[in-house]
Amino acid sequence: FALKVPAKYTGRFCRLFAVYWLFTASVAYLLVAVCAAFADLHGGTLYGLMQYAPVGILPALLPFLLMGANALTGVFEGYRNCNFVKRAGQVFERSGVIRIGVVGSYGKTSVKNILKTLLSEKYSVIATPESYNAPMGIAKTVLSNECEGKQIFIAEMGARKKGDIKELCDLVKPDYAIFTGVCEQHIATFGSLENIWAEKSEILKCGAKKVVCGSSLKTWLQETDDRVLVLDEGADAQFGAMATAFTLRLYGENVPVKT
């Protein structure tokens, strides 16, 4: 058994563990006290054995105690997270950095990494690390020391429920965006492919100067404006271990590209 990401004892974990421990200790003490009171009041072997009942009852209550501790600390964590994200938005506004959002059901991390590599040849670029694609992950990247002095910020933007992309757009306010495509990823939370499209397509309404869309989105994009660019599938792309060659078609022009 191996964790994808090594466990870290973050502040949130420590706060949750402390409240969980207090809940467990309090309930255990209460159960022991009640059972002991019954034993003293009524006497007898049966009531004497009741003193040991908490030993069998408490393990069954542990999941519910954890849920209760999480609900209690969640009030504080929600307030703290909201302020953290708000502060990141303020830093965004002051920085003047060019912001690029990457949205889609698949390929976000790969596109983000490729784009960062390409742009880094000319600009100072930072991208959200690994698969950070939620408000807290983006905010953490914005408020990190590595973000200072950067010219371009690339944000991977994910969604598991309705409203997630709108929330991320309000935070990032992308100047440019890439929309890779839609598929049945997270259909368990969205319910249908149409709902997934409706959520992901919020990136088209974010006010970006240009939104580059994958070729698979042609069937979804009924009406577009000049801001939306839909890419064609490359028929002559050649991939090798040391080089890549393809023809880039933009606005009716063909540009041969080799790497």
Segments and roles (model prediction):
Residues F1, V34-G48, Y52-A60, F64, ...:
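ATP-dependent carboxylate-amine ligase catalytic core
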Residues A2-L22, F38-H42:
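Transmembrane alpha-helical segments that serve as helix-helix packing and pore/cofactor-lining elements
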Residues G11, R94, T117-L119, Q238-G240, ...:
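A generic structural signal for short, solvent-exposed coil/turn residues
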Residues Y20-C35:
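Canonical alpha-helical transmembrane segments of integral membrane proteins
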Residues R99-L119:
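Glycine-rich phosphate-binding P-loop
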Residues V102, E148-Q151, L248-V255:
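A polyampholytic, Gly/Pro-enriched intrinsically disordered region
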Residues S105, E130, G214:
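Cofactor-binding loop segments of dinucleotide-utilizing enzymes, especially the Rossmann-like FAD-
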Residues F179-T259:
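Acidic, Mg2+-coordinating active-site environments of NTP-dependent enzymes
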